[in-house]
Regions:
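Mature, Sec-exported extracytoplasmic domains of Gram-positive
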Residues: 1-4, 24, 34, 38, ...
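Beta-propeller-forming repeat regions
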Residues: 100-102, 127, 141, 151-155, ...
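Non-cytosolic beta-sheet module surface loops
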Residues: 22-25, 59-61, 111-112, 122-124, ...
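Intrinsically disordered, low-complexity terminal and linker regions enriched in polar/acidic
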Residues: 3-5, 9-20, 29, 34, ...
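Recognizes extended acidic, P/S/T-rich segments that occur
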Residues: 29-62, 74, 119-166, 177
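Extracellular recognition modules
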Residues: 66-72, 170-174
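Pro/Thr/Ser/Gly-rich low-complexity, intrinsically disordered linker/stalk tracts
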Residues: 1-26, 78-130, 186-202
Length: 838
């Protein structure tokens, strides 16, 4: 029989709790574990095995943790004997003042068949406790035409059955006393007093329509005409008035994947007020190609002045136009080029987009200088191009221009097509492999604050990045894969994350923005993947040359995620199958074993979800797909976010069924997670089949993997459109297997081809539920759809949850991914697990 082990708290800091325990006679070692919820069903997670009688729990003390220490004695019947056990709850100690936006109440009034539906924001700072259906705290007095009509205590929505579309509404935060009297609250925040009156949405339906100023189309150098479509979006309070503004990316109809040849029109970014007024327009210029991989725009208040900025990769020719309130042009200016580049002869009038002839000439120049390439000089690559191509040496080196041209002809007409019929290098045009690259921070009003060199230059056209090494020769592909994000690396302030590369070399830069300047926090670089022949090799399954970060290469996805994976109060960067700690160190890079027994990286994938998937497991989890097929240990897997290890599946009796990851011989495409089955605990995960968070296959048809949305009043998860994402028109249908179709919008479209993304899924106003922003079919307006079903749940806006808020910032990054709260959000959630302290 085990005895009681007493834990004694010795000290507590912002990020650590120190404790010890008395000696247990006969103890061989002690097992320390913890969990992040008091619920009995939550499993303890082992932290350490030690012979010492003290321990430091390295967790942020802005929440409670439940620590258990077990003493084990000598083995009996080949099992360790548990002889003592003790538990302790760590106290709240740290109350960080996290930098956040000061939003208004976000009240909306929407006409329905039964009256006027109202919904508004509730903030984390206003929450005081828990109820059976949500949170408690501040309540709300509702006004119609400046006359009180209700006091709402159990939610943040209300249906005024007597209201009309001619009425105006406002809400006031109040505190209902024991006597039932509602008294106004006081405070210095924008939402602490009664909000301004709002009118009912003019559409007469459950969407707000914002007319936009569509840019004029154009013609490429190849004579192809293009128009502009509304694409990805972001939100931020750029002028500090408490309302979100809407940043819209305009993609030309000829925007391209980084692997596809051809000219593109210019990418354009607009900023709009909610009434449709255009504040500014950023024309990325000719030297930023249009497509999902090139322009990731991070909108956030980076400097803490109460107004959101925008950070984006720029180039010579990028031009900002600011507008007056009447729509006239206030100013127009190019970005600031570096003095070094200007002295070298570069200018804002330059155009570095290559024609097919430009590319041919570029290759002739490369071949002429072959012997000067650092990899050739170092002996890493063959001395001659003939050896690279597997033919007998024919020419003296260094090559003359004529000889180089002959070899380029051979390369383009014989060698490349011989490796793949898709290698049509004579038609290679529309790419950019030369010229300066910049990173610019713009103020909310469009003013350029600072422009610096992009942290990791391209260096070449992709030769060093492996773009010529595989059978499919794709110059300017791996080298031009960009990601971006926002992370609270110090737990208090937001930092900008800018990245380049993930198939081979992978690079990540982190900046703060202080007093008008970028301030580097850290740089991460895997180094190039060594190749013996840049024209015939496989760089995907190797590590980069850097001793510290080499294993990061090839692990990134077409997006990233930001989360505090180890509960230390600082956010980490989840870079696909790898993770960078808040201080820039490599936290892990996940490997496992192929069926052959060979150890291999989990590798690149198209879809990743970081969330509280299993409510009974401490910390966060990651669900990925991996596209390495036979070369990857898993086609998909559920991993522990803190360690990157693949979780195991267990039966109800505790039998270990092996890893919750399955080998696949083909690329499975995408995956998704969400609460789609009310009868199964935890979030469900799916690719082709649906599984519980414990790894049990469920008898359900897999829903769409396009994009998820928390739309329903019952806290469940919905998806956009159907599971057949390769066929049909995606217009943003919200549905699930429980409720069926919940929203079937008309005259709208989703973006990005088969990916079927909305412009943005985010809780931009109203209560805790997410809103759906779609483009109108004619690309002249956006529509913001909201759910007008009444809910009796009271939760703070997810925009007040830092993990979710930065997720909204990075949602536009490359292959748009769903973002999640730091806590478990589902129809079976325990409201007591929602954090009330930042």
């Amino acid at each position: 029989m085990k005895s009681q082990l007493i834990l004694t708290l010795d000290d507590i800091e912002e990020g650590a709790v120190y404790f010890h325990w008395d000696n247990v006679p006969g103890a061989s070692f002690y097992e320390i574990s913890y969990k992040d919820s008091a619920r009995k069903s939550v499993r303890y997670k082992i932290l350490d095995i030690t012979r010492e009688r003290f321990y430091c729990l390295k967790k942020a003390t802005n929440r409670e943790y439940y620590v258990r220490v077990r003493a084990y004695g000598a083995k009996k019947d080949n099992e360790r004997l548990l002889i003592a056990e003790g538990t302790e709850t760590t106290p709240l100690y740290y109350f960080p003042k996290v930098q956040k936006e000061d939003l208004n109440r976000g009240l909306i009034a929407v006409k329905t068949e039964n009256g006027i539906f109202l919904a508004w924001r509730f903030f984390k700072r206003e929450a005081a406790g828990y109820s059976a259906t949500g949170l408690t705290g501040i309540d709300f007095r509702v006004y119609r035409n400046d006359k009180e009509i209700a006091v709402v205590t159990d939610s943040c929505n209300y249906l005024d059955k007597e209201g009309t579309d001619k009425d105006v509404y406002s809400v006031e935060p109040v505190k209902v006393g024991n006597d039932g009297v509602a008294e106004p609250v006081s405070g210095s925040r924008r939402a602490d007093s009664r909000c301004e009156n709002v009118s009912v949405w003019k559409s007469g339906k459950n969407y707000l329509e914002i007319e936009l100023s569509r840019p004029e189309g154009g013609v490429t150098p190849a004579g192809e005409h293009f128009e502009y479509r509304i694409n990805d979006m972001s939100v931020g309070d750029v002028d500090g008035d408490g309302d979100y503004e809407y940043i819209v990316k305009w993609d030309p109809t000829n925007s391209q994947d980084v692997s596809i040849k051809g000219y593109t029109g210019r990418c354009i970014l607009d900023c709009y007020k909610i009434d449709g007024r255009l504040m500014w327009r950023l024309d990325m210029g000719p030297n930023i190609r249009a497509g999902a991989h090139y322009t990731q725009f991070m909108v956030y208040d980076f400097d803490g002045d109460g107004k959101a900025e925008m950070a984006v990769k720029t180039a010579p020719g990028t031009i900002m136009t600011k507008f007056n309130e009447d729509g006239s042009i206030a100013s127009k200016s190019y970005i600031t080029m570096s003095q070094i580049d200007k002295a070298a002869g570069f200018s804002n009038e330059d155009n570095y987009v290559c024609s097919a002839q430009d590319y041919y000439d570029h290759m002739v120049d490369l071949f002429m200088k072959w012997g000067e390439h650092p990899e050739v000089m170092a002996g890493h690559w063959p001395d001659t191009l003939e050896e690279c191509f597997g033919i007998e040496k024919k020419y003296p080196y260094p090559l003359s221009k004529a000889d180089a041209a002959e070899l380029v002809d051979y390369f383009m007409d014989v060698y490349a097509p011989g490796r793949s019929a898709k290698n049509e290098l004579r038609k290679f045009e529309g790419f950019i492999y030369d010229g300066p690259e910049y990173l610019t921070m713009f103020a909310g009003d469009g003013t350029e604050l600072e422009t610096i060199d992009y942290p990791f230059p391209r260096q070449d056209d992709g030769l060093m990045w492996g773009d010529y090494a595989l059978p499919r020769i794709e110059p300017c592909n791996r080298v031009d894969r960009f990601l971006a994000g926002v992370a609270y690396l110090d737990g208090i302030h937001p930092s900008l994350i800018m990245c380049r590369g993930y198939y081979t070399r992978s690079t990540i830069a982190a900046y703060d923005f202080k007093e008008g300047h970028f301030v580097e926090r850290f740089m991460v670089d895997s180094g190039h993947v060594p190749m013996s022949n840049p024209f015939n090799d496989n760089p995907h399954d190797r590590e980069g040359s850097d001793k510290e970060y080499g294993s990061l290469s090839g692990q990134g996805d077409h997006s990233l995620s930001i989360a505090d994976v180890d509960d230390d109060g600082f956010q980490e960067i989840i870079y696909g199958a790898a993770c960078i700690d808040h201080d820039g160190r490599l936290k892990y890079s996940s490997y496992d074993y192929l069926p052959s027994g060979k150890r291999a990286k989990l590798g690149h994938g198209d879809s990743m979800h970081v969330a509280k998937i299993d409510p009974d497991q401490p910390g966060l989890q990651i669900f990925n797909v991996f596209e390495g097929a036979k070369a990857a240990p898993y086609g998909y897997a559920l991993r522990d976010a803190e360690t990157g290890t693949v979780r195991h599946r267990f039966t109800e009796d505790g039998e270990d069924l092996g890893p919750f990851g399955f080998y696949a011989e083909t690329d499975l495409g995408r995956c998704m997670i969400g609460d789609i089955d009310p009868n199964t605990k935890g979030l469900q995960v799916w690719v082709n089949d649906v599984y519980s968070c414990d790894g049990m296959e469920l008898p359900l048809e897999a829903p769409s993997t396009n994009q998820a949305i928390r739309w329903a009043a019952d806290l469940s998860t919905q998806v956009l459109d159907r599971s057949d994402y390769l066929n049909g028109e995606h217009r943003g249908v919200v549905n699930d297997i429980t409720h069926g179709v919940m929203l079937d919008p008309e005259d709208t479209l989703c973006n990005n081809g088969t990916k079927g993304n909305a412009c943005l899924v985010a809780s931009v106003f109203g209560d805790f539920r997410e809103d759906l922003i779609l483009r109108r079919k004619d690309d002249k307006a956006i529509r913001i759809y909201t759910n007008t079903e009444l809910t009796n749940h009271k939760l703070y806006t997810p925009m007040d949850d830092i993990m979710y808020r930065v997720g909204i910032a990075w949602q536009n990054t490359c292959y748009n991914q769903t973002c999640y709260t730091s806590y478990y959000y589902a129809s079976d959630m325990s409201f007591k697990d929602i954090p009330l302290v930042d």
